[in-house]
Amino acid sequence: MKESFFNLSGHFKLQLLQNEKVLFEWEKHNAIIQPTIEKLAKSIMGLIPYEPNTNFVKIKLGDGGSNLDGSPIDITGNETDLNNSLVEYTHKGLPGVLYDDQGQSLVSYINAVELKQGLYKLTIIIDNTDGNSPNDVLREYSEVGLFFANDDMFAYRTFPRVSKDSSTNLKIEWTFQFLTNKGIQQP
Protein backbone atom coordinates (compact mmCIF):
# COMPACT_ATOMS: atom_id res chain seq x y z
CA MET A 1 0.00 0.00 0.00
CA LYS A 2 1.32 3.42 -0.89
CA GLU A 3 0.99 6.24 1.60
CA SER A 4 0.55 9.82 0.59
CA PHE A 5 2.76 12.11 2.62
CA PHE A 6 1.43 15.29 4.08
CA ASN A 7 2.39 17.81 6.73
CA LEU A 8 5.98 17.92 5.51
CA SER A 9 7.22 21.05 7.16
CA GLY A 10 10.09 22.21 9.24
CA HIS A 11 12.36 25.06 10.10
CA PHE A 12 15.05 27.15 8.38
CA LYS A 13 17.76 29.04 10.25
CA LEU A 14 20.55 31.15 8.77
CA GLN A 15 23.46 32.61 10.73
CA LEU A 16 26.33 34.86 9.67
CA LEU A 17 29.25 34.12 11.99
CA GLN A 18 32.59 35.78 12.65
CA ASN A 19 34.93 33.86 14.95
CA GLU A 20 31.89 31.92 16.20
CA LYS A 21 30.12 35.16 17.17
CA VAL A 22 26.65 35.53 15.62
CA LEU A 23 26.52 38.74 13.56
CA PHE A 24 23.13 38.05 12.00
CA GLU A 25 20.46 35.41 12.52
CA TRP A 26 17.19 34.78 10.70
CA GLU A 27 14.65 31.99 11.17
CA LYS A 28 11.48 31.00 9.37
CA HIS A 29 9.40 27.95 8.50
CA ASN A 30 10.57 25.64 5.75
CA ALA A 31 9.52 26.11 2.15
CA ILE A 32 9.16 22.69 0.55
CA ILE A 33 8.65 22.64 -3.21
CA GLN A 34 5.29 20.98 -3.88
CA PRO A 35 6.11 18.55 -6.72
CA THR A 36 8.96 16.95 -4.73
CA ILE A 37 7.33 16.43 -1.31
CA GLU A 38 6.71 12.68 -1.60
CA LYS A 39 10.10 11.99 -3.20
CA LEU A 40 11.85 13.95 -0.45
CA ALA A 41 10.04 12.20 2.38
CA LYS A 42 10.66 8.73 0.93
CA SER A 43 14.33 9.53 0.33
CA ILE A 44 14.87 10.76 3.89
CA MET A 45 13.12 7.73 5.34
CA GLY A 46 15.04 5.26 3.17
CA LEU A 47 11.84 3.96 1.56
CA ILE A 48 13.35 4.17 -1.90
CA PRO A 49 16.74 2.76 -2.88
CA TYR A 50 19.61 5.20 -3.09
CA GLU A 51 19.84 6.74 -6.51
CA PRO A 52 21.77 9.90 -7.33
CA ASN A 53 18.60 11.72 -8.38
CA THR A 54 16.64 10.84 -5.23
CA ASN A 55 19.02 12.14 -2.57
CA PHE A 56 20.27 15.58 -1.60
CA VAL A 57 23.31 16.35 -3.70
CA LYS A 58 23.37 20.06 -4.38
CA ILE A 59 22.95 23.45 -2.72
CA LYS A 60 22.77 26.75 -4.58
CA LEU A 61 23.00 30.26 -3.13
CA GLY A 62 21.92 33.39 -4.95
CA ASP A 63 21.01 37.04 -4.65
CA GLY A 64 17.55 37.02 -6.25
CA GLY A 65 15.52 36.46 -3.11
CA SER A 66 15.07 39.98 -1.79
CA ASN A 67 13.21 43.17 -2.62
CA LEU A 68 15.02 46.46 -3.22
CA ASP A 69 14.80 47.26 0.50
CA GLY A 70 16.55 43.95 1.35
CA SER A 71 13.46 42.18 2.70
CA PRO A 72 12.77 38.63 1.42
CA ILE A 73 10.38 38.10 -1.47
CA ASP A 74 7.39 35.80 -0.97
CA ILE A 75 7.66 32.14 -1.97
CA THR A 76 4.92 30.29 -3.85
CA GLY A 77 6.13 26.71 -3.21
CA ASN A 78 6.22 26.01 -6.94
CA GLU A 79 9.67 27.44 -7.70
CA THR A 80 11.97 25.27 -9.83
CA ASP A 81 15.27 27.15 -9.41
CA LEU A 82 16.82 30.17 -7.77
CA ASN A 83 16.03 33.56 -9.28
CA ASN A 84 19.75 34.37 -9.62
CA SER A 85 22.17 31.62 -8.63
CA LEU A 86 25.70 32.79 -7.70
CA VAL A 87 27.40 29.68 -6.27
CA GLU A 88 26.68 25.96 -6.35
CA TYR A 89 28.07 23.13 -4.24
CA THR A 90 27.67 19.44 -5.09
CA HIS A 91 27.87 16.29 -2.97
CA LYS A 92 30.07 13.74 -4.75
CA GLY A 93 29.69 10.70 -2.51
CA LEU A 94 31.94 11.57 0.43
CA PRO A 95 29.98 12.05 3.65
CA GLY A 96 30.00 15.59 4.98
CA VAL A 97 31.70 17.26 2.01
CA LEU A 98 30.39 19.50 -0.78
CA TYR A 99 32.45 20.69 -3.75
CA ASP A 100 32.34 23.85 -5.83
CA ASP A 101 32.67 23.85 -9.63
CA GLN A 102 36.48 23.92 -9.30
CA GLY A 103 36.48 20.65 -7.35
CA GLN A 104 37.42 22.38 -4.10
CA SER A 105 36.10 20.99 -0.81
CA LEU A 106 35.19 24.18 1.01
CA VAL A 107 31.75 23.50 2.40
CA SER A 108 30.82 20.99 5.06
CA TYR A 109 27.48 19.54 6.01
CA ILE A 110 26.08 17.34 8.74
CA ASN A 111 23.04 15.09 8.40
CA ALA A 112 21.03 14.15 11.46
CA VAL A 113 18.09 11.79 11.11
CA GLU A 114 15.65 11.03 13.92
CA LEU A 115 13.03 8.83 12.30
CA LYS A 116 11.19 8.11 15.56
CA GLN A 117 10.41 11.80 15.77
CA GLY A 118 10.01 12.20 12.00
CA LEU A 119 12.87 14.71 11.80
CA TYR A 120 15.70 15.20 9.33
CA LYS A 121 18.17 18.01 9.94
CA LEU A 122 20.79 19.27 7.51
CA THR A 123 23.44 21.76 8.65
CA ILE A 124 25.57 23.42 5.98
CA ILE A 125 28.57 25.61 6.79
CA ILE A 126 30.17 27.81 4.14
CA ASP A 127 33.48 28.80 5.70
CA ASN A 128 35.42 32.04 5.46
CA THR A 129 37.46 30.83 2.47
CA ASP A 130 34.44 30.31 0.22
CA GLY A 131 31.25 31.98 -0.93
CA ASN A 132 32.96 35.35 -1.27
CA SER A 133 33.25 37.36 -4.44
CA PRO A 134 36.36 36.74 -6.57
CA ASN A 135 37.75 40.13 -5.52
CA ASP A 136 37.48 39.32 -1.80
CA VAL A 137 34.83 41.98 -1.28
CA LEU A 138 31.34 41.48 0.07
CA ARG A 139 29.03 39.09 -1.74
CA GLU A 140 25.34 39.39 -0.99
CA TYR A 141 22.99 36.42 -0.67
CA SER A 142 19.22 36.35 -0.26
CA GLU A 143 18.11 32.90 -1.47
CA VAL A 144 19.13 29.27 -1.11
CA GLY A 145 17.87 26.01 -2.61
CA LEU A 146 18.46 22.29 -2.06
CA PHE A 147 18.43 20.02 -5.11
CA PHE A 148 18.39 16.38 -6.16
CA ALA A 149 21.03 15.29 -8.71
CA ASN A 150 18.55 15.67 -11.58
CA ASP A 151 18.26 19.38 -10.64
CA ASP A 152 14.79 19.06 -9.10
CA MET A 153 14.73 21.67 -6.34
CA PHE A 154 13.03 20.27 -3.23
CA ALA A 155 13.51 23.10 -0.73
CA TYR A 156 13.80 26.84 -1.22
CA ARG A 157 14.08 29.78 1.12
CA THR A 158 14.42 33.50 0.61
CA PHE A 159 15.82 35.63 3.43
CA PRO A 160 16.87 39.22 4.15
CA ARG A 161 19.96 40.21 2.19
CA VAL A 162 23.16 39.02 3.93
CA SER A 163 26.68 40.19 3.02
CA LYS A 164 29.47 37.62 3.33
CA ASP A 165 33.20 38.22 3.04
CA SER A 166 36.40 36.33 3.87
CA SER A 167 36.06 37.11 7.59
CA THR A 168 32.68 35.37 7.96
CA ASN A 169 31.08 31.93 7.83
CA LEU A 170 27.54 31.27 6.67
CA LYS A 171 25.69 28.57 8.60
CA ILE A 172 22.39 27.15 7.37
CA GLU A 173 20.29 24.73 9.42
CA TRP A 174 17.43 23.11 7.53
CA THR A 175 15.05 20.85 9.47
CA PHE A 176 12.38 18.73 7.80
CA GLN A 177 9.54 17.16 9.77
CA PHE A 178 7.17 14.72 8.15
CA LEU A 179 4.20 12.52 9.02
CA THR A 180 1.90 10.18 7.15
CA ASN A 181 -1.76 9.79 7.90
CA LYS A 182 -1.18 6.19 9.10
CA GLY A 183 2.43 6.28 10.21
CA ILE A 184 5.46 5.12 8.29
CA GLN A 185 4.66 2.37 5.80
CA GLN A 186 6.63 0.71 3.03
CA PRO A 187 5.45 1.62 -0.46
PLM feature spans:
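Small cysteine-rich, disulfide-bonded extracellular modules of the LU/uPAR three-finger superfamily
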Residues: 1-141, 149-187
